[in-house]
């Protein structure tokens, strides 16, 4: 079986979905920009060697419809001989893209893949044109399609208090801002054209979504948004709404050696798993256990963790269930989706890229990226430095 390595991982800055810096920039343009920059950063790669572009996107309609992977690759001027496919595993879409590329490389069905994902939640909101079959309620709880209510239930089941959520939400913003000040985002963020408040064209170099003034005390004043009477989940402890894209260059170790490219990590294990849609945020737990078993590792072997912060209640429930509460100094060291936002199709390769950069910065060997997925799934990837 061929060894799979990641040579590069980049992303756009995260823009606010409401009147943000990318309000006049289309999802295809964000994606195409990263595709071009991956090639600029890796001149030893002949674009003709890319087997396929695999791009995650959840709301595949309007500008994100009709196979955005292909549209963006054509917009980027990539060779027309390269394939392009858009995949949808809801929140895990771009991590699914990584898994599909990895599986192809392992089995000899291609040597080089360009993967990533995008979501412009300002242009195509999450609930745009959602139409669940009412018969679904025969098999799942009525509120399973309301992500915030599933987080409320998960938090109650695992004893995650309002105070714990507020502290975690503030931590996300503080750590993301600290990462900005220390330059820890510099190797993954690619400056991207956007527009300032006046509408003038501007080069966006930093995340727009982080709120450095956020404290647990300020979050404690917010009202619950999903269960106004008995709830604990607020806008401040939910992932922000943002627009962005991410990308990775994935190839076989043999191809990287042939091209003289330096692999940053290899894929050690990967998995998906299902869970009850009513507690969809629990998905990372079975997915992580499955990925670790396939990698021949235990949770004790993981040196750095990236849990996607869909909600503080959700992320903390997974931390508690995996028994790593005593490892908070190894978890989401640059903050997460509460501060940066969760552009659905973008997030899987975004958190993976952040983890890879942190693994290098902290000089550790084994890392885990995992995320929950709407309607009851989880996805996880174990990375090892090479």
UniProtKB/Swiss-Prot annotation:
Keyword terms of this UniProt record: Acyltransferase, Cytoplasm, Fatty acid metabolism, Lipid degradation, Lipid metabolism, Transferase
GO terms assigned for molecular function: acetyl-CoA C-acyltransferase activity
InterPro entries xrefs: FadA, Thiolase, Thiolase-like, Thiolase-like_sf_Thiolase, Thiolase_acyl_enz_int_AS, Thiolase_AS, Thiolase_C, Thiolase_CS
Reactions that this protein is recorded to catalyse: an acyl-CoA + acetyl-CoA = a 3-oxoacyl-CoA + CoA
Pathway annotation from the record: Lipid metabolism; fatty acid beta-oxidation
Signal is among the record's keywords: no
Protein's cellular compartments: Cytoplasm
Enzyme Commission (EC) number: 2.3.1.16
GO term, biological process aspect, one: fatty acid beta-oxidation
GO cellular component terms listed in the entry, alphabetical order: cytoplasm
Enzyme class (EC, first level): transferase
Catalytic residues identified in the record: 91, 342, 372
Signal sequence residues: none
UniProt keyword annotation of Nuclease present: no
Subunit details: Heterotetramer of two alpha chains (FadB) and two beta chains (FadA).
Similarity field: Belongs to the thiolase-like superfamily. Thiolase family.
NCBIfam families for the chain: AcCoA-C-Actrans, fadA, PRK08947.1
Protein role: Catalyzes the final step of fatty acid oxidation in which acetyl-CoA is released and the CoA ester of a fatty acid two carbons shorter is formed.
Annotated protein name in UniProt: 3-ketoacyl-CoA thiolase
Gene of this entry: fadA
